[in-house]
Amino acid sequence: MIELAAIHHQPFNSDAYSYNGRTLHIKIRTKKDDAEHVAWFGAILTNTPAHMESERAYVAKIGRNKQPMITGLPKCGLHSGSAIRIYLTALMIETLFTEAMVHVRFRYRQTHVLNFRLFMRQTRLMHRLGQINRLVSNFSGAFRAGGKICSGKPLPWGRKDPEAHDFFGGHLQGIMTSWTIWKTWGEAGIYLTPIFAAPSNHKYDTLDYCSIDPHFGDEELFRTVVSRIHERGMKIMLDAVFNHIGTSQEWQDVVKNGETSRYKDWFIFILSLLKKAAMIHLRLVPRCRSSIAGTRKFRLICLILRCTGSANLISTAGVWMWQMKLIMRFGRNSGKPSPEKPDIFILGEIWHQADPWLRGDEFHIGHELPVHRTDDSLFFRRIDFSSQIASRINSQKMSGMKQVKEVMLNLLDSHERILTRCGGDQRKGARLFWHSCLLRQGRIYYPRKSGFTAAMIHCAGSAWFGKRKNRIKRCLAFMKPLIALRKQENDVLTYGALEWKLVDDQNDFVSFSRTHEGKELIYFFHQGREVRRVRLRDLKIASDKRIYDAWTEEALHDDDVVDIQPGDFSFLGRSKFC
């Protein structure tokens, strides 16, 4: 008996949509183990749909964990005037495509009927952004100085723990003197944290969106940097922080008068923190409250600046992408490209699920924090079982369109921040590897000179002393091949199907694979306390395929055994013999 209340399918949205104009993706959610088999039929629609004839194709289950089972239809032909029927054991789902719309009817033993309608038009098709694959973030103020200091008096390296208004001399010229770093890392683009005029080092309290901060250089130097980046086949992305108001007159009135200020409702802040000396830190840079008319006016001014002065700067300099911080706090259409540069890509930062914002063409791509938190709960906080993590990843994977997930720029984090959060335990590098092999595009945050830890404040981090150089070198030695591997296996990691091989809660062991065009990558992550032995014979390798260690490219054999240490990972490849 199928539980009807557990059946979920919403035409279009992320349950039924066109992937590329030739392929239709359909997803159906049922209660765990309710549907043993799923099959679909496709045929040209006639006046007698009951006479549909077609070859039957079976669909594999995508997720099967403690959460309700998710079953998907990976591919089927999409033609105007065609019809598709999907069967789940006793449950029949009938989808009829006509010239104008799609009728979807759920039937249970021909007695229970749910009706849906869906318009599938060419203008509704969403195409993925093919140019995005590797992006490295850069915190310019503490990255590297490249000769003469542009402005201000920088602090000597390691003199003190940095505060919001401390400056270490990093500027745009330093980016041009670091080409060997970018070449070694093999990145496709550089994302600069805010570089517009602001008093702090993090620049989130922007004063002028139309000029480069003197700490970093000037407009001429910026154009030169962008030009040199383009010469090396790379792209550049800027950070827009219109959601913060900086040190404006209205905010200063709140700081001075507190509850009695006429502007106190303009901002989101904790009043008690204003009385503390730390109020200059980023966490206390106010965020605008979108429901207040005054802040809407301020945001309008920001958008005018974006469409005039800032847009002129990025269009003439050749900037490729602009990230909009906390885009969900803005109104609709605020993320659309300006008329001055319609070909610029807009990346939206979302603190929750980003897919709904992409469906409405608010911006081109996005990154969502729930993915980051899911990874952390497995490797750092250790508050969830492996099966819960797998289920959550399935839900994230199935929540949106595949072409959207393929270009989601979720933050991969920096090797320095990872070491800080895990207390210096370098085995936590598995966290970086885990993130890079799932369905998303990695964006590495490399904000500081080698030797900075990543303190969780939005100004520069603290400096490492003693053995910091050796630790950083070991981290870099891990990150470089990781980036190279992501570049080499980009097709598999972008388009490949995800299949969970083993999710063992008792021993904290997870294994899954990514498969694309005959090539399979198999991953093993072990967070338990004992050494885990993996016998390759248990993988049931076909005789016409070879297996190898994908990290070292060393050939392996059917009778080999791979030992995975606690907190470590292993990575195997399987493909046909050349």
Swiss-Prot record:
What start and end residues bound the annotated signal peptide? Answer: none
- Top class in the EC scheme: hydrolase
Q: Which SMART domains does UniProt cross-reference here? A: Aamy
Gene Ontology MF term list: glucan 1,4-alpha-maltohydrolase activity
> Which GO BP terms sit in this record?
carbohydrate metabolic process
Enzyme Commission number(s) of this protein: 3.2.1.133
Record keywords, A-Z: Carbohydrate metabolism, Glycosidase, Hydrolase
Catalysed reactions, semicolon-separated: hydrolysis of (1->4)-alpha-D-glucosidic linkages in polysaccharides so as to remove successive alpha-maltose residues from the non-reducing ends of the chains
The function of this protein is: Converts starch into maltose. In contrary to other maltogenic alpha-amylases BlmA cannot hydrolyze 1,4-alpha-glucosidic linkage next to 1,6-alpha-glucosidic linkages.
Family note: Belongs to the glycosyl hydrolase 13 family.
Matching entries from PANTHER family are given as: ALPHA-AMYLASE FAMILY MEMBER, MALTODEXTRIN GLUCOSIDASE
| The protein's name | Maltogenic alpha-amylase
- Species: Bacillus licheniformis
Q: What is the lineage of its organism?
A: Bacteria, Bacillati, Bacillota, Bacilli, Bacillales
